[in-house]
Amino acid sequence: MAPNAAVLVRPHIAGVHHLPTGRRLPRLAPPQAVSPPFSRQKGSVVAASGRVWASASGSFEKDRIGDDDVLASPQIVEESKVDLLKILKSANTIIPHVVLGSTILALVYPPSFTWFTTRYYAPALGFLMFAVGVNSSVKDFIEAIQRPDAIAAGYVGQFIIKPFLGFLFGTLAVTIFNLPTALGAGIMLVSCVSGAQLSNYATFLTDPHMAPLSIVMTSLSTATAVFVTPTLSYFLIGKKLPVDVKGMMSSIVQIVVAPIAAGLLLNRYLPRLCSAIQPFLPPLSVFVTALCVGSPLAINIKAVLSPFGLATVLLLFAFHTSSFIAGYHLAGTWFRESADVKALQRTVSFETGMQSSLLALALANRFFPDPLVGVPPAISVVLMSLMGFALVMVWSKRTKE
């Protein structure tokens, strides 16, 4: 008999049944075997008539299953789940492409983003901070606070190097490019504001263990911006901006403190729920980032496409490029003996090169009568996001290698 042939047990006589005519027919017992399995390939699992036949190494194994049981291989189902989780978790890798796509869409069809008004910015940024908090721990933030030298480096990049570069390129805009004074003031205003929450998210995507340090840097610059930003604007632009201290502190709590605290608590006390939602955070974060980039551009599309738009884009590109490079080399010089110098360089670079341009835009619209002052902040939101997340794509590949 062939090794893989199915064996059919012959029915045995369990008794006889007498018909009224006197003839007798044998009464059959329930069959002890079923039809051959659907597949005879090695390692396959098949189901038939309430039994599972598995052919492997020339033998059959039988395991009874219920009629309602799923007939698919558990291994295949599990592999499908793993593949889906990988796809969801890897959504962050397409952020640069999504940012570029949202920029093009905002230029071609502004109504696709104009519905996402400024009132949604705080909840959107808060969600990104929540995603960072879910993937962090209290210990990470304690360790970050214990590095005052790194925090100081980020602060120097934010409020010394960046304002100097802003003043330089703002002056060039007026003296060399002959742009209106309002556009030069707008470039300087961008350099006076605190760090952007998107810098924290960019750091998280590149060096996750550095995200708490980046958050501490941005929180400190945001908290002190209530005093520093008006002072810098007075010296650079000649106009002292009355910043709402209460509103600024409230924004810090809503956008940074509360979402991160919620994420940390969820990670600490509800780990199962945290694990369940973690795979869905990357694609949602990508979507939110696209909205935060496309909306300011779409809302201010007329100013961006003005005759001065291209020159302003070139100047802001040079400003942000110089800021990223200056922050990178600042940390490289400051921490050249540190074991994690490369990670610190990337973190300080993000902190120096990415500003809270949305805050600058709000200040421009509120305190400057000339609408051209708001053009550089609107362009800056898009440029710094494109450049920052392009660096994420490059640096994250290097860290994995």
Swiss-Prot record:
It is a multi-pass membrane protein. The chain crosses the membrane at residues 93-113, 122-142, 159-179, 185-205, 215-235, 247-267, 273-293, 299-319, 372-392. The keyword Oxidoreductase does not apply. It is found in: Membrane; Plastid, Chloroplast envelope. The keyword Phosphoprotein does not apply. Residues 1-46 form a transit peptide. InterPro entries: BilAc:Na_symport/Acr3 (IPR002657), Bilac:Na_transpt (IPR004710), Na+/solute_symporter_sf (IPR038770). It holds the Pfam family SBF. Keywords: Chloroplast, Membrane, Plastid, Transit peptide, Transmembrane, Transmembrane helix, Transport. One of its GO terms (cellular component) is chloroplast envelope. Belongs to the bile acid:sodium symporter (BASS) (TC 2.A.28) family. May function as sodium-coupled metabolite transporter across the chloroplast envelope. This is Probable sodium/metabolite cotransporter BASS5, chloroplastic.
